[in-house]
């Protein structure tokens, strides 16, 4: 993040400890991280290193055990669940490896519904515009089961970005896709994030995808590894 710029997301000495049958498990261990406006950050590291938990805590979906998480300058610990949801609404969006589309809604309804919930006008028209932007003008009335994996992720991208968020969290956004489709979805994601001016926090195992970010951080054993990053060994 550029020095002196305001953070859209800041984590300070954040820990996350979860119970297990074998006893408490330290998922995050003293994480410090700041993401500036419009910055594209890739988070890499082996499975189980805390990458997805970092996104969950940063987005306010999981409460840390200790430390401070500030989203758009707001201390998430001072907000209840409804308050965190209101803070995210229209300003933060999420895309996951699993597409999380509502199966009983068409593509255009999946994109329009969050806009309607947020009180936006012309939600259906905006949804259609965004589905056109992701190359799916011919899939407006198709249900998720009628779409390929790549098409479902494009719908998820359109849904996430239609409200023109300030920050997009993406957890393995191309993880369920073949190489060709993954490249197409990645191109779309980076182009549309730039178009709306959003910051991006992206978890990925893909070194090619990671290298498209402005900055890469590596997670190891619940901490940010400050050593030299070799993107050719992301899964090591």
Which role does the model predict for each range below?
Residues 1-17, 226-236:
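ABC-family P-loop ATPase nucleotide-binding domain
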